[in-house]
């Protein structure tokens, strides 16, 4: 237990940085910044009772009854219309309920996160910013090998 944890009233059982997807930002030369998403290096021990932050946050929002009903709509539509339509599905839900954007990281974790490879569900929270980058810097994505005009090209960055 860390020194900080010894003083805490509550300790949440979270995975370590090696047991989950971890992000790093690099500032090589102003104004260029680089971002790297690392896959988990090891799995949590079989006898550990840990959760990643996305799961902890989602459970807290659910216990507070704050998760919008549109999450079910997003999951149904995603299953029916496919991942390539995720941007449109998410935007449709957000236009019906402003809480979608308020709780976007949790909703992305509970929807898109379930479709990501094992250990990357937390990366779903990056979807909105990845789409923003794809819109603002399409040439950078092309140089990275992500070609095409898909509306969800930014989402492919995290897949």
What role is predicted for each listed range?
Residues 1-94:
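Non-catalytic alpha/beta scaffold blocks inside enzyme catalytic domains
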Residues 88-159:
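Long, low-complexity segments enriched in small/aliphatic residues
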């Amino acid at each position: 237990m860390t020194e900080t944890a010894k003083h805490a009233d509550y300790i949440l059982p979270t995975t370590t940085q090696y047991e989950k997807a971890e992000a790093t930002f690099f500032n090589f030369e102003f104004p260029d910044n680089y971002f790297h998403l690392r896959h988990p290096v090891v799995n949590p021990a079989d006898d550990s009772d840990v959760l990643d932050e996305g799961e902890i946050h989602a459970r807290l929002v659910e216990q507070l009854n704050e998760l919008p009903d549109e999450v079910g709509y997003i999951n149904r539509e995603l299953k029916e219309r496919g991942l390539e339509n995720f941007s449109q599905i998410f935007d449709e839900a957000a236009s019906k309920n402003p809480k979608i954007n308020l709780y976007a990281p949790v909703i992305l974790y509970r929807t898109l996160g379930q479709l990501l490879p094992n250990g990357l569900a937390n990366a779903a929270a990056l979807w909105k910013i990845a789409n923003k980058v794809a819109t603002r810097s399409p040439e950078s994505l092309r140089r990275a090998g992500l070609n095409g005009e898909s509306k969800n090209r930014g989402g492919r960055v995290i897949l």
